[in-house]
From Swiss-Prot:
Function: Cardioactive peptide.
Protein keywords: Amidation, Neuropeptide, Secreted
Phenylalanine amide, modified sites: F9
Primary location group: secreted
GO terms classed as biological process: neuropeptide signaling pathway
Taxonomy, superkingdom: Eukaryota
CC annotations in GO: extracellular region
Location of the protein in the cell: Secreted
Nucleus keyword on record: no
Similarity annotation: Belongs to the FARP (FMRFamide related peptide) family.
Protein's name according to its UniProt entry: FMRFamide-like neuropeptide
Species the sequence originates in: Callinectes sapidus
Length: 9
């Protein structure tokens, strides 16, 4: 999984 923070979703 990955954080939405850096993707700005």
């Amino acid at each position: 999984g990955y954080n939405r923070s850096f993707l700005r979703f």
